[in-house]
Design a protein with these regions (language model features):
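N-terminal glycine-rich phosphate-binding loop and ensuing alpha1 helix
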Residues: 1-27
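Hydrophobic/aromatic residues located in beta-strands of well-ordered beta-sheets
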Residues: 24-26, 71, 101, 129, ...
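A conserved hydrophobic position in a structured secondary element of the catalytic/binding core
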Residues: 28-29, 81, 161, 208
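Conserved core of the sugar-phosphate nucleotidyltransferase
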Residues: 81-175
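Conserved alpha/beta core of the MobA/IspD/sugar-nucleotide pyrophosphorylase nucleotidyltransferase superfamily
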Residues: 147-225
Length: 225
């Protein structure tokens, strides 16, 4: 519980503020989460526990969807998710130039650049993703990385997909790059998909520890939640 409500209820409340979404559904393999969501007026569906990735779970939960539909995968541990970021990702997919969209934020420390838990992204000039890696990329051959250059960004765990591409994605087995880096988005690049990237200054706060929960609770209470 965070500030008197289940974590997932806070996430649903934040996501519903995005103006681009027609519906919000929680996909889970835990009946306790379904009960918590429904208690606070949300929608939730049970999905098989053996699904290989979050993307596969989204496709399963969505059921029948059209090729032109846009589906957004939002982590269930981020109650401070910015609704404007969700809307920005959806906007990137409106014209059909990209099959997926995601988000990045600047890397601010050498420790984060080196950490395998921080996923780095190299971008093209139109901010399309060229590659995702747990390694520190791009590698500056001649000097220490200039973190102020704008080249060094970390991936945030939010995705939007065009429906037609999502159908193709879940039919493909994990590729060698995905299995090596343990990054499901590499399957999309391996398939030849174009992934639009939205830059944001918001680093996001996932609730993974009691300390994270306490920090988020202070922020929510400070907002008058």
């Amino acid at each position: 519980m965070i500030a008197g409500k289940p974590l997932v209820a806070w996430v649903v409340e934040a996501v519903k503020k995005a103006t681009s979404l027609d519906d919000v559904i929680v996909a889970t393999d835990d009946e306790r989460i379904v009960a918590a969501v429904e208690q606070y007026g949300g929608k939730a569906v049970m999905t098989p526990s053996e699904l290989p990735s979050g993307t596969d779970r989204i496709a399963c939960a969505a059921g029948d969807f059209a090729d032109d539909d846009i589906l957004v995968n939002i982590q269930g541990d981020e109650p401070l998710i910015d609704p404007a970021l969700i809307d920005a990702l959806v906007a990137k997919l409106r014209d059909g130039a990209f099959e997926m969209a995601t988000a990045v934020t600047p890397i601010k420390s050498a420790a984060d650049l080196a950490a395998k838990t921080v996923v780095k992204v190299v971008l093209a000039r139109d901010d399309a993703a060229l590659y995702f890696s747990r390694a520190p990329i791009p590698c500056d051959r001649d000097r220490e990385p200039d973190l102020a250059s704008g080249l060094y960004v970390r991936h945030l765990g939010i995705y939007a997909y065009r429906g037609g591409f999502l159908k193709r994605y879940v039919k493909e087995p994990p590729c060698a790059l995905e299995r090596t880096e343990k990054l499901e988005q590499l399957r999309a690049l391996w398939m030849g998909a174009r992934i639009a990237v939205v830059r944001t200054a918001d680093e996001g706060i996932g609730v993974d520890t009691p300390e994270d929960a306490a920090r988020v609770e202070r922020i929510l209470l400070g907002r008058g939640a």
